[in-house]
């Protein structure tokens, strides 16, 4: 099980050697030492996760991966083609809308009138979704998840940008179509982790050209949550903490 953020925050208060202040050769030894036994390395995701990155996001994430490689992590290209199928199912409506609609109809019918307008079309479409289509989507996801699990036979994690775009400015008069178009862009690299029954951690690794945070996502096989946390913590020791990389939030500065 992934430990809560408070655990990680407390963990960083413990005294430890900083690999950013010692020779790179020693850094490599430390980096290897803090990883779990038999660490298989980091895979770099295929172009589906990178094409369309805005404002230098892709370059910043690749630079972070290069830093981990120089520190001793084994790195190689690792495609995850099942991500395309997962995102296709998501774009078709996924399975959550019909499951939510069924739950509301059964347990909280009065809540239907209070649903946010941007979510109304999805719930209305779910009302007419056939059982055959729902089961077909579940089958497609199950087969894709089974295939995706095998991609981790020779790597522990697959690295991608967390979000490919700079956070958009949201407006109050934004309609459902524009909202969902932006939403799809925001969750593009996140959907595969959920739909393929994987787990993931994200680390801030810099600021894009508009000064917004950029994340490095490390995706691991489902059930490898503890191992993923260990790897993410090791990567953070090399790359730096969020405060070291991003600085203090503007509203938190004295």
Question: What does each of the following model-derived ranges do?
Answer:
Residues 55-79, 105-110, 134, 138-155, ...:
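Acyltransferase
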Residues 149, 180-204:
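Small-aliphatic-rich amphipathic alpha-helix that forms the alpha element of a beta-alpha
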Residues 51, 166-167:
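Short glycine-rich, flexible loops that bind phosphorylated cofactors or substrates
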Residues 5, 156-158:
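Short, Asp-centered acidic motifs that coordinate Mg2+ and/or phosphate
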Residues 91, 135-136, 167-187:
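Short, surface-exposed loop/helix-turn segments at secondary-structure junctions
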């Amino acid at each position: 099980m992934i430990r809560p953020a408070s655990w990680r925050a407390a963990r960083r208060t413990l005294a430890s050697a900083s690999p950013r202040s010692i020779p790179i050769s020693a850094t490599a030894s430390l980096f290897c030492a803090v990883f779990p036994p038999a660490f298989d390395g980091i895979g770099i995701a295929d172009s589906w996760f990178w094409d369309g990155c805005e404002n230098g996001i892709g370059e910043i994430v690749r630079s972070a991966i290069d830093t981990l490689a120089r520190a001793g992590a084994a790195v190689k290209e690792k495609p995850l083609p099942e991500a395309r199928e997962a995102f296709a199912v998501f774009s078709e409506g996924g399975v959550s809308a019909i499951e939510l609609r069924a739950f509301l109809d059964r347990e909280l019918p009065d809540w239907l009138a209070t649903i946010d307008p941007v979510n109304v079309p999805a719930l209305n479409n779910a009302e007419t979704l056939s059982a055959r289509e729902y089961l077909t989507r579940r089958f497609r996801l199950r087969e894709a998840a089974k295939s995706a699990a095998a991609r981790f036979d020779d790597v522990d994690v697959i690295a991608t940008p967390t979000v490919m775009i700079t956070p958009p400015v949201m407006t109050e008069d934004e309609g459902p179509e524009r909202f969902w178009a932006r939403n799809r862009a925001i969750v593009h690299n996140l959907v595969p982790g959920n739909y393929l029954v994987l787990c993931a951690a994200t680390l801030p690794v810099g600021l894009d050209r508009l000064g917004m945070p950029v994340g490095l996502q490390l995706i691991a096989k489902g059930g490898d949550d503890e191992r993923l946390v260990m790897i993410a913590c090791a990567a953070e020791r090399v790359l730096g903490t969020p405060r070291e990389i991003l600085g203090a939030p503007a509203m938190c500065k004295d």
